[in-house]
């Protein structure tokens, strides 16, 4: 993967994600400064094995800006839970994030801090700082006076009939304190959970009424206790781990433009948490107002996305009635009308500011790319023409590679670049049928087949190559030259050797090495790497089909279990990395079956 330009990356807190060629998220991380953090991935040579592996298979990196590093942690956690990135699972587990847990599975539930999920407990969080969480727990005990002791101490107190120390000083109203019943205590737990779930207004209102009543009755000590509880509740609310109220499910959309290009950013919020971030660029029409641009953007967004219940905006879009009618006509659920909100509350407005910041960042990034990409791509083509002494500009370049599976199933691949950009619709895959495992003979066969398909194509056609690149050295180049002579076509051909990035040309004994920082070398490396990626993708499909057939040979593994195994582990590399315990945990899989599966997968990896 080629790193993004440093100037494109904002110096803001945010969450970044690495994706593979299929768009699967491999890794999610957070940063106080995105530019510095992402830069460290591409400049630091001392990386761990897992990060190096992740970078080797990544094809894209993206990011989302947020208001601060605490919000970055929350969004990072939300996405790790949502997408289960494989590299995050291995590098960071849930113990990095402290939670609040209410042990509802116990007869007398308690509130505690945990870094691991507890069975039969309800969890709240994550929270960014454990020392803040300890303060929060102390405040919650002050408000709800629920049990804090361990199960052993609780049983001892019940057996002895003597409350624990917390109960004796009125800090705990557990049943062992002899001041409350089990039913009354369960009501306290219910109120605590409602408070943690965001239903805080009713509790605050109730406490205020009780405080005023106590003050009116001149019960000043009780009124002071209630006042302290109200202050404690308000402090806890200011530290809530919830991004928005859990009742909020909506799309938050912001649009910014430079009068020629509009950048649209959409945060999809479900149950108070950001689940997805979408970004687009639209061509802005001349003399188009901001409200008209907003309406046009919304229409185009929901041609691509499913419709939400609510859409939250900064401003009122033009033709609001017509826009609302259009969206509701598209809505499958006719019983539910889509609400367009353009007067957001304070909490929603803060999130919209974040959405707008991301839209501005993407617009700036797009502007930089738009101004530089065209110039650099054409500079690389002019450099290639100069260095390779070509008669014409190499507008269409084709690159060829040979791959095989353990010496069998030889195949060839062809990738095409036009004007310095990949043209994936022109990519081709060839099955090579020769008796011996011979890369040179395979390359000759591959090039012959490609050239014969060009015999009826005019040389001025856009489908006719101006330059052919062979992945390999002198032997592969000789095979390609032989194929050109066999078919009778004249197309410039060079071989690119990976060891020193050497270019070999027909009839020349010495290699050509392009300047190390030149755009022309960068383009050739990009073409060669794309050729490897495409060839590897095809071989991976064949390899996995072959290993699937191997799995069917294991006694006790039928079609249903093989499919179950492949659904759990997305690739056979994951099967090899999985432990026997992970595999045997699948329904219907025993330890012996898991051992046979591991043995099969590991034996296959050695072939």
From Swiss-Prot:
Its main location: cytoplasm. GO terms for cellular component: cytoplasm; excinuclease repair complex. One of its GO terms (biological process) is nucleotide-excision repair. Keywords: Cytoplasm, DNA damage, DNA excision, DNA repair, Excision nuclease, SOS response. Residues 201-236 form the UVR domain. Disulfide bonds: none annotated. Residues 11-89 form the GIY-YIG domain. GO terms for molecular function: DNA binding; excinuclease ABC activity. NCBIfam families: PRK00558.1-5, uvrC. Interacts with UvrB in an incision complex. Belongs to the UvrC family. This is UvrABC system protein C. It comes from Tropheryma whipplei (strain TW08/27) (Whipple's bacillus). The gene is uvrC.
